[in-house]
A protein has these predicted regions:
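Short, Lys/Arg-enriched anionic-surface-contact patches
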Residues: 1-12
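C-terminal peripheral helix-coil segments that are non-catalytic and often amphipathic
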Residues: 79-102, 116-119, 123-131, 159, ...
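Short loop-to-helix capping motifs
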Residues: 24, 51, 131-133, 145-147
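Helix-turn-helix
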Residues: 20-67, 72-77
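Amphipathic, non-transmembrane alpha-helical scaffold segments
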Residues: 60, 151-162
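Membrane-interface starts of transmembrane alpha-helices
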Residues: 184-188
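Short hydrophobic clusters on alpha-helical segments that form packing/core surfaces
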Residues: 13-21, 125
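Secondary-structure edge/capping motif, primarily at the C-terminal ends of alpha-helices
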Residues: 136-143, 202-206
Length: 242
């Protein structure tokens, strides 16, 4: 009689792999590490995936964010051919750095409401970072051990995104919409790193009880702080002479 797979085992495998990959990186992780965390035999995992590399690529391709992920119909998951794997990785990582709100803002010569435009972009970036928090953590942890991934993620895509955001900030500075007393590259990096820390990195903080409010409140505070860092101060009312 064929053995049935537990219905939640695939989700457990994904959750555990994301956790172990984020801690050790893909290269340093063994399937036995994942199995040990799950409390199952290493051999049982090969009913679901042929290798840790296949599991890593599947996670990245699907952008496995928080939530329930259904197991594919065809198991075990197999590693695509090298050229296919590289193409899919480039496409998926590229989509993680595409923010439609930023591209729409960049296409405008001047905004009707600079504050509203900036807030829309900041919220869109925050939401994207939140959504891809776990797979992006795995990628950043694994990239130093994988030169091709490092070059794609850090040297190309991430660097291009920072430059694109800085170009938009500079354009708004020239138009008088953003404060112009700071270098646009520093302003952009400050805004983006603030978002990334609170939307993603703080969840891996060595002090998990940092005394912060709930996630929704944190998001609102970060949005307000980033807006305050980029928008010019409102003009002060003139004092009446007595």
């Amino acid at each position: 009689m064929a053995r049935t797979r537990p219905p939640d085992r695939f989700q457990q495998l994904l959750d555990t792999a994301l956790r172990v990959f984020a801690h050790k990186g893909v290269r340093r992780t063994r399937m036995s590490d994942i199995a040990r965390e799950m409390g199952v035999s290493p051999g049982s995992l090969y009913n679901y995936v042929e290798s840790k590399e296949a599991l890593f690529h599947w996670i990245v391709e699907r952008g496995a964010a928080d939530g329930v992920v259904e197991a594919p119909d065809a198991l075990p998951i197999r590693l695509p051919a090298p050229a296919v794997a590289r193409r899919r990785l480039r496409e998926e990582l590229g989509s993680a750095f595409r923010i439609p709100a930023l591209e729409a803002a960049f296409a405008r010569r001047a905004p009707a409401d600079a504050r509203a435009e900036l807030e829309k972009v900041v919220r869109a970036v925050y939401a994207q970072v939140e959504r891809a928090r776990r797979p992006m953590t795995v990628i950043e942890r694994s990239a130093p051990d994988l030169p091709e991934l490092y070059a794609l993620y850090f040297v190309q895509l991430r660097r291009e995104f920072f430059a694109r955001f800085a170009d938009w900030v500079a354009r708004r500075q020239r138009g008088g919409h953003f404060r112009d007393d700071v270098d646009p590259r520093v302003a952009a990096r400050f805004a983006l790193e603030s978002i990334v820390y609170f939307a993603r990195h703080r969840f891996g903080d060595l002090d998990p009880d940092a005394g912060l409010p709930d996630d929704d409140a944190v998001r609102e505070h970060v949005v307000r702080l980033v807006l305050a860092s980029l928008l010019p101060d409102p003009p002060r009312p003139r004092r009446r002479r007595t």
